[in-house]
């Protein structure tokens, strides 16, 4: 019972072979230290560093910032973006916007011009039933109705 079991030697041999294969794979992955000198660091980036076209870094930054500033100023001029400076200007702008809103609201309630006045040359018989009659049309219709009644008598 306490002796060796049959076939356990092969198991040990197989385990040893597998362990050897793993160690061989790990050994190939180890990095060997290099004897070459370390790579030199790039020079530090300063404002006098030449970037491109023989222009220094501060030239490029200045030109780019002027370009962006000119675009912002142009857009503000086109869309009339102005920051008011005083309380009086702020209140005046508020009142102006309020008056403009009231004007547009009242303008929407006004009926179209063709409903308010008679258009010369318009055929009155083709008039829509839903449209609003003007005073002149009502008077003319009343006169025609009275004339027909007198003609029938």
UniProtKB/Swiss-Prot annotation:
It is a single-pass type I membrane protein. Residues 80-153 are cytoplasmic. Keywords: Deafness, Membrane, Signal, Transmembrane, Transmembrane helix. It is found in: Membrane. Disulfide bonds: none annotated. Its main location: membrane. GO terms for cellular component: plasma membrane. One of its GO terms (biological process) is sensory perception of sound. Residues 1-28 form the signal peptide. It comes from the Eukaryota. Pfam families: TMIE. Expressed in brain, kidney, liver, lung and cochlea. The chain crosses the membrane at residues 59-79. Residues 29-58 are extracellular. Auxiliary subunit of the mechanotransducer (MET) non-specific cation channel complex located at the tips of stereocilia of cochlear hair cells and that mediates sensory transduction in the auditory system. The MET complex is composed of two dimeric pore-forming ion-conducting transmembrane TMC (TMC1 or TMC2) subunits, and aided by several auxiliary proteins including LHFPL5, TMIE, CIB2/3 and TOMT, and the tip-link PCDH15. May contribute to the formation of the pore. Forms the MET channel composed of TMC (TMC1 or TMC2), TMIE, TOMT, CIB (CIB2 or CIB3), LHPL5 and PCDH15. It is linked to Defects in Tmie are the cause of the spinner mutant strain phenotype (sr). This disorder results in hearing loss and vestibular dysfunction due to neuroepithelial defects in the inner ear. It is recognized by behavioral dysfunction, including bidirectional circling and head shaking. Auditory function in spinner mice is found to be reduced, based upon the lack of a startle reflex to sound at any age. Breeding experiments indicated that these defects are inherited in an autosomal recessive fashion. This is Transmembrane inner ear expressed protein.
């Amino acid at each position: 019972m306490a002796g060796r079991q049959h076939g356990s030697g092969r198991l040990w041999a197989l385990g040893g072979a597998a362990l050897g294969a793993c160690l061989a794979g790990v050994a190939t992955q180890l990095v060997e230290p290099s004897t070459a000198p370390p790579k030199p660091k790039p020079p530090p980036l300063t404002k006098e560093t030449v970037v491109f076209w023989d222009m220094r870094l501060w030239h490029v930054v200045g030109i780019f910032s002027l370009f962006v500033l000119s675009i912002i100023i142009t857009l503000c001029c086109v869309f009339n973006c102005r920051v008011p400076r005083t309380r009086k200007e702020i209140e005046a702008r508020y009142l102006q916007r309020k008056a403009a809103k009231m004007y547009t609201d009242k303008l929407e309630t006004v009926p179209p011009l063709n409903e308010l006045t008679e258009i010369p040359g318009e055929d009155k018989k083709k008039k829509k039933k839903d449209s609003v009659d003007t005073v002149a049309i009502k008077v003319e219709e009343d006169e025609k109705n009275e004339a027909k009644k007198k003609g029938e008598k």
